[in-house]
Amino acid sequence: GKLRIIIGNKELVYSEIKNDYELNRPKELPADFDWNSTYGLYMQGKDWLNQKMYGNAEKYLKAALEKDVYFIPALVSLSSLYYKKGMYLDACELVKRVLSLDTYHGEANYLYGLCSRAMGNLADAKDGFSVATFSPGFRTAAYEQLGELYMREENWEKAEQYALKSLEYNQMNLYAKQLLIVLYRKSNHAEKALSEIEKMTEQLPLLHWVRFEEYLLEASTAEEFSSLICNELSFETYMEMAV
């Protein structure tokens, strides 16, 4: 017979029965697929992008666009790559090409917002993030970005509104929680900030920026904050928080 071992409430299962673990997902590339087609070149570029081999990714994505200058998946991926490289103007030009065809494309609008923000075009940034909120995959991040923009303008009410909207769609969005704590501190709502900090330290006690925010509100917690940063290269932790 075949052996099956179950430990606890199926916390660990070992089985010799093939149907318990064998999957039907395709495991081989199709032999008749044209890897030199527009989509084939894009897929190769996307694969290199996932591996963070950006030089190869750029090569194949550009090759795909040589065949079709309006191939949206390649435009979006290459725009994302250029944004990561700090080539904001180039990234923005590519993503504008997408928006000229599909004005509600979620990722394209989000990238448009990021590039516009990086170049200081805040009205365009708000425009891009606002339209990106229509897409569920980018909604929580786009709301958080809008909150950051309004906090920069010291529009505390709108910043809070967008931070809370972001958390409605993803309660564990740490960027939105950080935004909420920072804006409460900067708008002199220390009690609200400390309340959010308390919730965060219960959930993630080693999230150092939370304890730093607590220190900014209560200087007496300085020793407690620094005592928990005890990794080998502790200066890197401080530098990451500063950035």
Positions of predicted regions on the chain:
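Long, contiguous interaction/recruitment modules in multidomain scaffold/adaptor proteins
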Residues: 1-36
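Structural signature of tandem alpha-helical TPR/SEL1-like repeats
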Residues: 52-59, 84-97, 118-131, 152-165, ...
